[in-house]
């Protein structure tokens, strides 16, 4: 099978000669793609990966590529089983010299997406000859339509509801022959014929991926139902309708992502002190002190820390809810030494900086740009994770937090609904604090609930944290996620992915 993704965090070393050099991340898709590929590879699945060749990001020199190609050639001379290269890089100078995965301008981003798909359609698919293709988001949206024309079943994963549109003419000018599969694409207006559609009638790339695929999935069950039911007005009508069509045809599912196994307080090298659920009380204090020193917060291991690890994006992530009440919660819980820590980039970064300066909150509130190691330390140091997202296709911080003993505070939506349940100490259930009204007062209520929990006697509080950590490790893991994807793959193929799997799932009839 072939997984097509514009970004990935890492690849298993056994997949190719330069696998250890390939890392390009812009968001959660990179982590999810990496974890899924690793899980499939470890199970013995014949998995191949196609991604752009971000030469500068990969720190790959031309000499490395020549050495890798020469080694593959030599292997082919001496062995029938030559350790087949499973990594397929889309080659074009459009990718070579980038400092980041996605351009800042939509036109440049569109060009990059079309070039990537050209290489996959014209070169990589014919070379790999996959039995099944797994595509991800709008930058792979043309591929399901092409694959359908070739008789290759395709799974299309919607990580983000962002899309782009363009004409057949523009697509063809990038070297993709749409004349052979244009009927499998989704147009802004109902197409009459190829010639009529070619110049004016634009193709929607994300919706084309949904329309052309044999099966689709979102990255949480609740977000799928929210889209199908039209809960979110900002989702474009054509996207909502096509996802609803797939759902009603029995060809859509929500599959929760999971954090990478590397997120573990037992092994995380970014921590000042590693720990387990059994010794978390003492070791989290060590990490808290180190985090406070590095961020300029007042050093106090008894201070409750509320940690913001996500983008400061007011459209999705809800930082404006916190900015409205930040002064009030610091003031009202001054005697409790409450601290708030941001390790994130985004539009509201300067907003929080100004609040800190205006009220001289420098030792109570830190605003730090995103840094991977500091963010990981933040999970270990903090007591609560702030995620008041208006919508959330999946989300990962609310799953990482419990694994590190930091309880999430979330709005009841999408993947947050699927992963966080309100804490019920009496029944020893739940793993966080959930508010139902997306406004500042709703968030304030949840923070108050968290502070009530923090004020409990230590034996009661620590017992709940230990339970939540253990449940987090058991629940939020990549084996569970990979199992769900394997079920879909096998249903689409109507056979096991690997030969030693004896049981088969009930087949899903592909949409023809």
What are the roles of these predicted feature ranges?
Residues 1-512:
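Catalytic cores of nucleotide-sugar-dependent glycosyltransferases that transfer UDP/GDP/TDP-activated
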């Amino acid at each position: 099978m072939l997984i097509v993704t514009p970004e990935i965090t890492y690849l298993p070393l056994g997949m190719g000669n330069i696998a250890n050099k390939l890392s390009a991340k812009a968001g959660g898709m990179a982590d999810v793609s990496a974890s899924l590929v690793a899980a499939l590879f470890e199970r013995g699945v014949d998995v191949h990966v196609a991604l752009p060749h971000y030469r500068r990001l990969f720190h790959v020199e031309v000499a490395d590529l020549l050495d890798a190609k020469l080694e593959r050639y030599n292997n082919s001379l001496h062995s029938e089983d030559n350790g087949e290269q499973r990594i397929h890089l889309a080659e074009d100078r459009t990718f070579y010299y980038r400092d980041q995965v996605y351009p800042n301008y939509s036109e440049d981003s569109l060009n990059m997406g079309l070039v990537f798909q050209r290489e996959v359609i014209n070169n990589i698919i014919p070379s790999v000859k996959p039995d099944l293709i797994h595509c991800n988001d709008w930058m792979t949206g043309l591929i399901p339509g092409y694959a359908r024309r070739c008789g290759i079943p395709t799974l299309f994963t919607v990580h983000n509801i962002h899309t782009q549109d363009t004409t057949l003419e523009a697509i063809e000018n990038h070297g993709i022959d749409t004349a052979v599969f244009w009927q499998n694409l989704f147009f802004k207006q109902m197409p009459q014929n190829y010639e009529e559609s070619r110049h004016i009638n634009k193709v929607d790339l994300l919706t084309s991926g949904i329309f052309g695929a044999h099966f689709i999935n979102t990255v949480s069950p609740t977000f799928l139902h929210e889209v199908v039911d039209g809960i979110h007005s900002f989702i474009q009508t054509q996207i909502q309708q096509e996802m609803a069509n797939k759902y009603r045809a029995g060809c859509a599912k929500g599959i929760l992502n999971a954090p990478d196994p590397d997120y573990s307080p037992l092994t995380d090298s970014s921590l000042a002190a590693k720990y387990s659920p059994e010794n978390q009380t003492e070791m989290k204090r060590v990490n808290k002190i180190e985090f406070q020193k590095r961020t300029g917060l007042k050093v106090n291991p008894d201070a409750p820390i509320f940690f913001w690890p996500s983008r400061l994006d007011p459209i999705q992530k809800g930082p404006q809810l916190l900015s409205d009440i930040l002064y009030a919660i610091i003031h009202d819980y001054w005697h409790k030494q409450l601290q708030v820590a941001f390790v994130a980039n985004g539009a509201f970064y300067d907003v929080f900086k100004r609040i800190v300066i205006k009220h001289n909150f420098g030792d109570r509130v830190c605003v730090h740009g995103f840094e991977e190691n500091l963010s990981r330390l933040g999970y270990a140091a903090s007591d609560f994770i702030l995620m008041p997202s208006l919508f959330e296709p999946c989300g990962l911080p609310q799953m990482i937090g419990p694994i590190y003993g930091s309880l999430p505070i979330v709005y009841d939506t999408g993947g947050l609904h699927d992963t966080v349940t309100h804490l019920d100490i009496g029944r020893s259930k739940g793993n966080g604090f959930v508010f139902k009204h997306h406004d500042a007062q709703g968030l304030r209520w949840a923070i108050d609930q968290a502070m009530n929990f923090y004020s409990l006697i230590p034996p009661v509080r620590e017992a709940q944290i230990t339970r939540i950590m253990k449940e987090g490790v058991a629940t939020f893991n990549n084996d569970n996620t990979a199992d769900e994807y394997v079920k879909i793959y096998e249903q689409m193929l109507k056979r096991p992915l690997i030969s030693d799997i004896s049981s088969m799932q009930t087949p899903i009839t592909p949409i023809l």
